[in-house]
Amino acid sequence: MARLILLRHGQSAWNLENRFTGWTDVDLSPAGEAEALAAARLIRDEGLDFSVCHTSMLTRAIRTLHLVQQELDRLWTPVRKHWRLNERHYGALQGLDKRETAARHGEDQVFVWRRSYDVPPPVIAPDDPKHPVHDPRYADVPPDVLPCGESLEATVARVLPYWYDAIAPDLMAGRDVLVAAHGNSLRALVMHLDGLDREDVSRLDIPTGLPRLYELDAALRPVSYRYLGDPAEAEERARAVAAQGRLEKN
């Protein structure tokens, strides 16, 4: 039976500041570093291991993975980095404070941008310096496939080819796999694994720094899945993700 661990990166500096991050390359906060180390201990306490790792091209996911590997004395484990595991691209929203954006555009509009399945955020132009076409880490990616703002639907379409081309073959070969990625790229994988529809995945929240363990049959269908650690903590962290972008009530 193959095992797959999905891990959202620890809290980032912009998670802490409640900003839309997307493809902006920010680092972990001190709390995020602690979450990554705690995730490693949860994996160790369950007696789990992994023989190959996958992550995105963004620092917060890469550093989360490295902290887990270091804590578990697994820095030698092969790692594959790929842009298809990057966070959803939030277009012109990247860098904006979520609550300030809600105050300006309304909570309902921000909810649609964040949680709807097929509505993209306002996009950025290809000549914008923040467009990924200008980032050297994507120099080998065809410019016409680099996003300028994505819906969750577009994120799913971007992520799933990597599942079929890289992650699934590792699992089919009998390797236990750790994927350290982002809230929306992981939502795409969970949607596929759990057979969620667009309404279900729109309500799905992935907490930072908590490993989600899947046990998969020979056809890579889930036999079981759960968050490691305290289920109440997983629910609390997921609620915190859902609350982002809401205005404070007086």
From Swiss-Prot:
Its EC number is 5.4.2.11. One of its GO terms (molecular function) is phosphoglycerate mutase activity. It is an enzyme of class 5 (isomerase). SUPFAM superfamilies: Phosphoglycerate mutase-like (SSF53254). Gene3D superfamilies: Phosphoglycerate mutase-like. Transmembrane segments: none annotated. It catalyses: (2R)-2-phosphoglycerate = (2R)-3-phosphoglycerate. Coiled coil: none annotated. Pfam families: His_Phos_1. One of its GO terms (biological process) is gluconeogenesis. The keyword Isomerase applies. The record marks 182 as: Transition state stabilizer. Pathway: Carbohydrate degradation; glycolysis; pyruvate from D-glyceraldehyde 3-phosphate: step 3/5. Keywords: Gluconeogenesis, Glycolysis, Isomerase. It comes from the Bacteria. The active site is at 9 (tele-phosphohistidine intermediate), 87 (proton donor/acceptor). Belongs to the phosphoglycerate mutase family. BPG-dependent PGAM subfamily. Homodimer. This is 2,3-bisphosphoglycerate-dependent phosphoglycerate mutase. It comes from Nitratidesulfovibrio vulgaris (strain ATCC 29579 / DSM 644 / CCUG 34227 / NCIMB 8303 / VKM B-1760 / Hildenborough) (Desulfovibrio vulgaris). The lineage of its organism: Bacteria, Pseudomonadati, Thermodesulfobacteriota, Desulfovibrionia, Desulfovibrionales. The gene is gpmA.
